[in-house]
Amino acid sequence: MASYDAIAELPLEIESCSFEGLELVLGEFERLTTVIRFSGGGHEGVGEDVTYDAVDHVAQQSAGPPDGLTGKFSFDEFSRRLGGIDLFAAGGPEREMSVDYRRWAFESAALDLALRQAGTNLAEILGREPRPLNFVSSMRLAKFEEGAKSSIEPLLERLAVYPTLRFKLDPFNDWDDELIDALVATGAVDSLDLKGFYKGTPVDVITDPELYAKLIERFPDAWLEDPDVTEETKPLLDPVHERVTWDAPIHSIADIEAMPWSPPRTVNVKPSRFGPISKLFAAYDYCEERGIGAYGGGQTELGPGRGQIQYLASIFHPDTPNDVAPSGYNDPAQATRPGLPSSPLEPSIDPLGFRWRA
């Protein structure tokens, strides 16, 4: 049975919807998200909108919920109903991808509520056992400030407190031989996010074939995520294509099939990129049936959304380098002092619903 079939006919009653804004300053980066709260039948379901543009959150929170959300449905009926509701009626979106991010938030809240109303939880209804969750910490080695240089110090500061921590790093154009050698010496790098699909964003990286060649050679066991495949880089990537994986362009099964060197050995199944849960669960089934590995990824969630992606990773792909570290690892102040959980993260699911207990 398809995974989605297990939840499609869950009864769902929504009596009201409300929003809660969350905000956190992470160094030079201010992150806003919105918690979606559905209430019905004495229960509450939650999800988190991880749209990146602050103006989209402010508009939504000021305007309140759109019409058409309340009533009695099956979960699948509600999902289809969402497809006909303008979730950005208050304005926006600033970016097209935010449509899927917000759809994911509303569906997550609805699924959490439907499962609670049914007296069950997601792992139970899918027949999947939550397992200890392997995670990596994702970071760049340079601040977002103009002229900031990459440094190994942020990584070493974290390793000093959490010596078994593994990393997914964002290589930047200023990575020189000295820095690369120092990173290799740590033995702590699992993945390199080459950001080949980002254009016009603060995380853009200029494609540098010479840097690609160094990274491929010096990190022979690291995953190479989202390379920019050009006439200059493809000959470098062809011999190591089994190490190539994809994140930013993956929103559906069709996207997985369309990537170079398909099928990939593994792929980043980032829940919020898929939007409707039906598409996400179809991708999980597709990868499992074809022996394609999967790992999870987050969007700097500040609330329940982080736990929900950890929940999914723990039941679908717990043993892979999941980029879903506890939120404290995103905060330099917390990540450099004791107290955060280490990998693997023990399952901590709520007896009801779709929620991971922090």
Regions found by a protein language model. Give the residues of each.
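C-terminal extensions of enzymes
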Residues: 330-358
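Short glycine/serine/threonine/alanine-rich loop segments
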Residues: 120, 292, 318
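Catalytic core of soluble alpha/beta enzymes
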Residues: 175-311, 322, 326, 330-339
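Broad gene-expression machinery/nucleic-acid interaction feature
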Residues: 33-35, 132-134, 266
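Structured beta-strand/loop patches that form or line metal/cofactor-binding pockets in enzymes
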Residues: 1-57, 61
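Metal- or metallocofactor-binding catalytic centers and their adjacent structured scaffolds
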Residues: 39-118
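Residues at alpha-helix termini
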Residues: 116-117, 289, 315
